[in-house]
């Protein structure tokens, strides 16, 4: 079945994953004559609930600190009786003293879901934890609370790379985390295609993730692993983080990148950029908002790994190979463009008109099909939103620049969803297939496109961050067309060199030389001797 197992590490990643799972849940169809576009067996596991009914739950393991799960209990309506009387899973088997803290009350949204009522609209004030907008039941085995650290503690902050490393090492020595938490999900899979890891890169979760990936790679040497590494540049900008704390986060990232790079098939550092198109309006201080935008891009670009359509389906290993076409280039950049769902009036016009130009204009309003974009931009497609972190100690707005600011693209995959298939698209797809069989120069960009008519859903759990042409928020319950991309390009070279220079002075002599050499070696993999613009002209 080519199953994918997910690892969720920390509060920020759990916000992201909650948006991801809510979207997956919305793709279920309940009519026998309606086949879903997505193969749900890839991300969901069958089971038997407490009352003997069949269940379907995510193949995921969720780690968070004490207090990070909010009002979500380890058990739920499907498994509560089965687990009653059992000790909740937590990484501690020593003597216990019962201390009851006041329970975190459920949000009104969760109360309405449990009662089968229409939930009230969510706001940044009512979303306190990722569990406040969660629409999915998880198996009790999926929920792992780490009691050694408390969420948002000022006394023992979970903010340093070494802290995460040490926590994993101590817990793994005592409990064997992989064997206890991850292996049961892997062993129940028929033919696992890979593991996706959602983690922070610039805090202690980076150290935790690096050690976890090392263990996984030792046990499952050939398994494809995608790492989605979030950075909190936008939250730091909104909160005015001190220069010292920003330097700490960059040092954490440098350490995480050099370690994760050794084990992951693809590493995607991402953050919400300082500059966004006018069609996106969000609260930069809200994790709910920030991760919603990132989730729309990530959920879209990974669709080929779970689509039923064989013409637009590939495994994680195949996707990784296509991105890493020229050596050890496994650090990728994430991009996205979107357009609102066509109105009913526009759909009528689209279906009824024979005017090619009018149809083309309406289709362009709905963004562009990936195959057409690849045909028109054989050296790489640059989308409206670039999630690549700047890695700057002092915040610099990324220029939206012209062609001179665009780095050389080595390889790129694009996924489009929701666009009309017309003659232009068919011709572009055929041209792409012909190009794939042509003998290539190592200096040519490797391009691959995927498409599905399945639009990205705007659920009632998703914030209204997208705007229409008049600036009004898009209504919940609708859907949008999305084009999302993963690219390996020459900009990584300069960013890693800059990161090396910035953090070098903040790291002790013992580690400075080794870390500097590893960053330089990584950077050299992305230096091909030229880019479409001068290095001096880049901001990042």
From Swiss-Prot:
**Source taxon at top rank:** Eukaryota
Write down any Gene Ontology CC term: cytoplasm
Q: Which keywords does the record carry?
A: Mitochondrion
Q: What is its main location?
A: mitochondrion
Entry's InterPro entries?
A: DML1/Misato, DML1/Misato_tubulin, Misato_II_tubulin-like, Tubulin/FtsZ_GTPase_sf
Checking CDD domains in the record gives: misato
GO biological process entries: mitochondrion organization
> Per the record, which residues fall in region Disordered?
517-540
Where is this chain's protein located in or outside the cell? Answer: Mitochondrion
Q: What is stated as this protein's family in its record?
A: Belongs to the misato family.
* Job of this protein: Involved in the partitioning of the mitochondrial organelle and mitochondrial DNA (mtDNA) inheritance.
Record protein name field: Protein dml-1
């Amino acid at each position: 079945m080519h199953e994918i197992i997910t690892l969720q590490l920390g509060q920020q990643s759990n916000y992201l994953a909650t948006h991801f799972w809510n979207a997956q849940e919305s793709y279920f169809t309940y009519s026998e004559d309606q086949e879903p576009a997505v193969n749900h067996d890839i991300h969901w596991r069958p089971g038997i609930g407490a009352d003997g009914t069949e269940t379907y739950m995510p193949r995921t393991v969720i780690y968070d600190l004490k207090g990070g799960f909010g009002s979500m209990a380890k058990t739920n309506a499907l498994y509560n009786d089965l687990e009653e009387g059992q000790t909740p899973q937590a990484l501690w088997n020593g003597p216990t003293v019962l201390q009851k803290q006041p329970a975190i009350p459920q949000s009104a949204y969760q109360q309405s879901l449990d009662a089968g009522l229409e939930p009230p609209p969510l706001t940044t004030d009512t979303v306190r934890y990722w569990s406040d907008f969660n629409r999915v039941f998880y198996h009790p085995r999926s929920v792992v609370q780490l009691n050694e650290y408390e969420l948002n503690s000022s006394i023992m902050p979970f903010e340093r790379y070494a802290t995460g490393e040490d926590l994993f090492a101590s817990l793994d020595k005592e409990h064997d985390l992989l064997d206890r938490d991850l292996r049961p999900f892997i062993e129940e899979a028929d033919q696992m295609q890979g593991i996706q890891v959602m983690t922070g890169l610039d805090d202690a979760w980076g150290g935790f993730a690096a050690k976890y990936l090392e263990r996984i790679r030792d046990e499952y040497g050939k398994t494809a692993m995608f790492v989605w590494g979030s950075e909190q540049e936008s939250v730091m900008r909104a909160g005015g983080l001190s220069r010292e704390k920003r330097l700490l986060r960059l040092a954490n990232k440098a350490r995480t990148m050099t370690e994760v790079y050794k084990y992951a098939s693809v590493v995607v550092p991402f953050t919400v950029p300082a500059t966004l198109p006018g069609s996106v309006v969000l609260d930069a201080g809200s994790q709910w908002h920030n991760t919603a935008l990132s989730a729309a891009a990530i959920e879209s670009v990974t669709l080929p790994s779970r689509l039923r359509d064989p013409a637009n389906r590939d495994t994680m290993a195949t996707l990784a190979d296509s991105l890493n076409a020229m050596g050890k280039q496994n650090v990728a950049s994430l991009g996205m463009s979107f357009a609102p769902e066509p109105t009913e009036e526009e759909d009528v016009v689209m279906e009824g008109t024979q005017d090619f130009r009018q149809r083309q204009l309406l289709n362009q309003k709905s963004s562009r099909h990936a195959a057409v974009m690849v045909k028109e931009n054989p050296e790489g497609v640059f989308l409206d939103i670039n999630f690549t972190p700047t890695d700057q100690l002092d915040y610099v707005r990324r220029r939206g620049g012209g062609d001179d600011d665009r780095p050389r693209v080595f390889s790129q995959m694009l996924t489009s969803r929701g666009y009309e298939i017309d003659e232009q698209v068919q011709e572009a797809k055929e041209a792409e297939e012909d190009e794939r069989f042509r003998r290539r120069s190592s200096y040519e960009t490797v391009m691959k496109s995927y498409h599905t008519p399945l639009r990205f859903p705007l659920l009632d759990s998703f914030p209204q961050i997208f705007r229409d042409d008049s600036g009004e928020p898009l209504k919940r319950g609708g859907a949008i067309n999305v084009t999302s991309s993963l690219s390996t390009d020459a900009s990584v070279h300069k960013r890693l060199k800059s990161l090396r220079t910035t953090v070098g002075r903040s790291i002790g002599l013992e580690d400075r030389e080794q870390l500097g050499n590893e960053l330089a070696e990584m950077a050299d993999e992305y230096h091909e001797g030229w880019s479409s613009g001068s290095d001096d002209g880049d901001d990042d």
